[in-house]
Design a protein with these regions (language model features):
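C-terminal catalytic histidine-bearing segment of alpha/beta-hydrolase fold enzymes
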Residues: 125-186
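Short beta-strand immediately N-terminal to the catalytic nucleophile in serine-hydrolase-like folds
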Residues: 31-33, 57, 114
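Short beta-strand/loop motif that positions the catalytic acidic residue
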Residues: 112-115, 119
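Mobile cap/lid helix-loop segments that gate and shape the active-site cleft of serine hydrolases
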Residues: 6, 59, 64-104, 136
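A conserved short beta-strand
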Residues: 50-62
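Short glycine-enriched nucleophile-adjacent loop
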Residues: 16, 38-49
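Alpha/beta-hydrolase active-site loop
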Residues: 2-22
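Alpha/beta-hydrolase fold nucleophile elbow
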Residues: 23-35
Length: 186
C-alpha cells in the first residue's frame, strides 16, 4: 500500500491474470475507479492504453491543493502510506496528481468524469480543473456534474449508474469509435 505508488502494479498484474481466463476478453476492457480508486484510474491511464473506456467518480486530481482543505489526509494518509513522503513531498504528490500530467493520459481511452457539486471529501474543483485541461488537449471526455450531490453521489445514484453503464456500453460493449474532437457542425 503506497497510495498510488507500486500498488498500481497490482492492478496491471490483474490484466495478465485475466488474459488466462477463457471467458475474459482483454481486448475490450473498461476501468472504473471512485475516490482514491479514481486517482488509481488516472495513474493506470498514464501507464496503459489497454482500456476501451474509463470512468472516474469523485477522484482527486491535485493532492497538493487538497492539503489545506483536508489536513488530516496529509497526517493519516500521505505521511503514513507514501514512501519517502517527508523528503520529497511535492514530487510524490505530483506523481499521484493527474492535473500535472493530463497530457500523458492515454489519448485513445475516452474518459467519463462524475463529481458531486457538494462533495466536501474531494473538492469539485479537482474535476473541473482537469476537465478544462482535457478539453484543451482534445481528450475525449464526458462530464457529469451532479448538482447538490455529495461525495458518494447518493442523491443521484441511479442516474450515475445509468450514465456509467451507457458510457461503457458505447465504447466497450458496442466498440464505437472515438469521437471527432475537432470543432465541427453547422
Amino acid at each position: 500500500e503506497e497510495f498510488g505508488g507500486q500498488d498500481l502494479n497490482d492492478v496491471l498484474n490483474l490484466i495478465l491474470l485475466l488474459a488466462n481466463e477463457p471467458k475474459a476478453d482483454t481486448s475490450r476492457m473498461g476501468v472504473y475507479g471512485f475516490s482514491r480508486g479514481g486517482m488509481m484510474t488516472y495513474l493506470l491511464l498514464r501507464k496503459s492504453c489497454q482500456f476501451k473506456a474509463a470512468v472516474v467518480g469523485g477522484g482527486p486530481t491535485d493532492l497538493l491543493k487538497w492539503i489545506p482543505k483536508r489536513p488530516e489526509m496529509e497526517t493519516y494518509v500521505y505521511a503514513e502510506l507514501i514512501p519517502d513522503y517527508h523528503n520529497n513531498k511535492e514530487v510524490e504528490l505530483k506523481k499521484r496528481s493527474a492535473i500535472y500530467w493530463a497530457d500523458e493520459l492515454c489519448p485513445t481511452t475516452p474518459l467519463m468524469i462524475l463529481h458531486g457539486s457538494a462533495d466536501w471529501r474531494v473538492a469539485p474543483e479537482n474535476a473541473l480543473e482537469l476537465l478544462v485541461k482535457l478539453f484543451e488537449l482534445k481528450h475525449p471526455v464526458r462530464f457529469l456534474f451532479l448538482e447538490g450531490a455529495q461525495h458518494s453521489l447518493a442523491e443521484f445514484r441511479q442516474e450515475a449508474r445509468n450514465s456509467i453503464r451507457s458510457f461503457f456500453d458505447h465504447y466497450v460493449k458496442n466498440e464505437n469509435p472515438l469521437p471527432d474532437m475537432e470543432l465541427h457542425g453547422r
